[in-house]
């Protein structure tokens, strides 16, 4: 199965060690969401994505992230890590590759709006 990661699980971030240790491959693909979403930075410093847009924030954007191939064990581990269903919930979205192929993948959406410093959405967590 494939999971779209957009935050601290990405390469070069603190929690990437989880994917590095347990993913099926040591490589990933850079992809972008087909639909637009609102991604914001919480006051805790990590990003969250809203499934449904909120008029409290700027316009939704196509999000950039990494696509990782994982197994059943890792998806259950990520569910616990992402505190599903309290903090996040897992759902599916479509992402597009650079060659324009579209794929259905998992993503973690915020279960509720978190506190933010501003209302400006971001395209990519850097």
Segment roles from a protein language model:
Residues 1-126:
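Glycine-aromatic micro-motifs
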């Amino acid at each position: 199965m494939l999971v779209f990661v957009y935050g601290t699980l990405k390469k070069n971030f603190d929690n990437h060690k989880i994917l590095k240790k347990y993913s099926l491959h040591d490589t990933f693909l850079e992809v972008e969401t087909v639909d637009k979403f609102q991604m914001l930075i919480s006051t805790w410093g990590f990003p969250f994505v809203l499934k449904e847009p909120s008029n409290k924030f700027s316009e939704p954007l196509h999000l950039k992230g990494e696509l990782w191939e994982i197994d059943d064990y890792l998806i259950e581990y990520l569910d616990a890590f992402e505190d599903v269903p309290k903090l996040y919930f897992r759902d599916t979205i479509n992402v597009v590759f650079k060659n324009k192929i579209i794929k259905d993948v998992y993503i973690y959406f915020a279960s509720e709006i978190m506190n933010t410093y501003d209302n400006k959405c971001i395209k990519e967590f850097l």
